[in-house]
Amino acid sequence: MKKQNKEGFTLVEVMAVLSISVFMLLISIHPIQNKYNEIAEGIFWKKFDESWMRLVTIVPKNGQKGNVYFYNDKAIFVISNQEKKYLYYPQGLHLYKYQNIQISASGRVKADTVVFNSEVTKLKYIITFQLAWGDYRIKKEKN
C-alpha cells in the first residue's frame, strides 16, 4: 500500500511552533508588567501631591484641622473628620511604618518623616514634611 503525500504540518511541528510562540510571549510579558508598575507608581506620586496640596489649601481657608493617615495599603487625607480621600498604594510600594501627619487650622505642619520602599524601582522614598506652611520634600535613595 502506498502512503498518500499530504501537504501540511505534522503534530510535532505544530507543537514546536506553539511552544516557541508561548515562550516568547511569556518573556515579553514580564518587562511590560514592570513598566506598568513604574507608571502606576508615578501616577501615585502625582495624586499624592495633588491631594496634599488640596489639603493644605483647604484646611487654613476653612479654619479646620486636617490629617493624613499612612496605613499599610493606603493614605487617607481627612479634613475635620468630614471629608476623606483614599489614595491606595500601587503594587510594590510599601510603607515602612504607620504615620499620622497633622495640619493645624492655620495650615502649619510639624516636622515629620514618612518612608516608603519600592520593589519596582528599587528605591527608598523618604518624605520629609517641613515645619510651617505644609511643604514637603521627597528624597530618593537606592535600596
Regions found by a protein language model. Give the residues of each.
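N-terminal helix-rich module
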Residues: 34, 57, 61, 65, ...
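Membrane-proximal N-terminal amphipathic helix
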Residues: 37-65
